[in-house]
Amino acid sequence: MIKYAEIHKIKIENEIRYIAKVYIDREEIEDKSFSSSTFEETAKYILKDCVISNYLDMTEMEE
């Protein structure tokens, strides 16, 4: 069984955050989500047991 993760770059109150959402067979696993202020830290945490499938920069959509 392969776990996939999407990393979302978002802006909350003028602070950039990277949020990883983990999925198995298209169902999100809420207790496996992770948030950090850097992409590298988020990716390092997620790559322990997941494949990163998508990166979505939500800050570009806000502008």
Question: Over which residues does each language-model region extend?
Answer:
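Short acidic DE-rich linear segments
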Residues: Y4, T59-E63
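Short N-terminal "domain-start" leader segments
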Residues: M1-I19
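A short, charged, amphipathic alpha-helix used as a generic interaction element across diverse proteins
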Residues: E27, F34-D57
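A short, structured beta-strand/loop element
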Residues: N14-K32
